Amino acid sequence: MPCNRAVFGAFVLALLISLQSVYFKLYEFYKNNETARNTSVAGFLKRHEVAVNVIVEFSFDILFFLCGLLGFELSPTARRLIFRRTASAEKADTVELEHVSSRRRNDSRDDSTVRNVSKTSPLASQRSRDHFDGDPREPAPPAYSPADFYPPPASPHICETPLSTRVAPSAPSASLFTAGGIGLP
C-alpha cells in the first residue's frame, strides 16, 4: 500500500535525521570538550577528521536516498528492474485473473497456463487462453497497443503555415533610447 509505505518512509527518515543530529552533537562534544579531549575517540577524530566526516556524510546520503525510495510508488518496470529476483516483485506485479479461484491460479501442481501475469509483461500477449477464457487457440490481446506509446498526429490547425510572409523585427532605433533619458549620442 503506498500510504503505508510513505508513512514508513517518513518514520525512517525522521529516525535518520535524529541519528545524524546525535552524531553531530557527539562529534562536537568530543572535538570541543576539555574533559573529552584526552580520550581515544577524540584522538582518533583529530587525526582522521576529514576522512570521518566524508565517510559519515556519504553514508547518511545513501541512507537518505534509500529512505526516499520507500516513499515513491515505483512503476511496474522499475519494480521489475530493482526487485528482479525477489518474491516481492512477483507479488507487487501480478494481475488478478477473473473467474479463476486463487487456489487454482497459484497451484504449482496444476499444469494449465493460468498464472499471475503482469499487464506489461510480454507473456501477457503471448500466453494462450484456457477453457475459462474461451478458445485456447486464440491468442490473448496485447496489454497495450503501440498507439499508446506514440503521439497522435498533429491537428491541421496547429501546423498551418501563414499565408503572408513574416518579417523579422528590426533593431530598436536610437530615438527609442534617447526618449527614455539614457542619452545616447
Curated annotation (Swiss-Prot):
This is Uncharacterized protein VP12. Coiled coil: none annotated. It comes from the Viruses. Its main location: host cell. It comes from Colorado tick fever virus (strain USA/Florio N-7180). Residues 96-185 are annotated as: Disordered. Keywords: Host membrane, Membrane, Signal, Transmembrane, Transmembrane helix. GO terms for cellular component: host cell membrane; membrane. It is a single-pass membrane protein.
